[in-house]
Amino acid sequence: VDVSAELAVAVAAAEAAGTLLRREPAWISAKGAGGDLSTDLDLRSEELIVSRVRAAYPDDRIVAEESGAAGAEGDRVWFVDPLDGTNNLAIGLPVYAVGIAFCVAARPVAGVVHDPVSGGTWSAVRGAGARGPGLPAEVTPSARPPLLAWTQGHGLAADPATGALRTAVEARSGRLLQLWAPLVAWIMLARGRIDGMVGYRAELVDFPAGALIAAEAGVEIHRFDGRPFDLRVDLPESERNFVACRAGQFARIWPSGG
């Protein structure tokens, strides 16, 4: 399936949203009861992206971080994270990104991640590889303990199982990064800046764009039991658990095999 037109729309929308995020001040408000935040920039960025996608593909379904799902059920679905790393931006930490994924029959076929801070844009089409600054990555094996990133779903901070799993992963790592911006972590992994990424009940909206780019850049995504992770957007949250790393590195990160 030729998705070059959809990819072009996603790239242009993500970069336009990045310009907005980089130049405009943010008004911050609480989001839910778990200490999460939202800003007016989340909403404005999302409105910009959704309007562009809707103008180009009025019949497609769009699932966006702030506004949820809109449009008729169908095989063509867009996932929009207008500001991944809101809490970071709110405290002045320049670690955030924009992510857009286009999916057909529940599988991501095109993905874009834009970093407003560096101005870098990364993209991928399923089966055609990934493009962007630092790609393809030159990754050489290292004997040092792996540098890993961790991501978890919302509302799990007080969950004992989550804490135990995170502690176990950290014990196997040289350093465990919790960036609160999974899209940034996916790009770091795709570029070989980190050795792996572990996700537990990962959030859906920011998942497909980053995972597709990393996979097309040569990253292997495993289930906790070591089997290949089926990169689909219709999996329940309880099954969005993964270990992403380069070939042959799974046992270093997850030596128990599950």
Go through the PLM ranges and name each one.
Residues 110, 147, 195-196:
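Short, Asp-centered acidic motifs that coordinate Mg2+ and/or phosphate
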Residues 129-132, 136-137, 157, 249-253:
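Short helix-loop capping/hinge motifs at secondary-structure junctions, enriched
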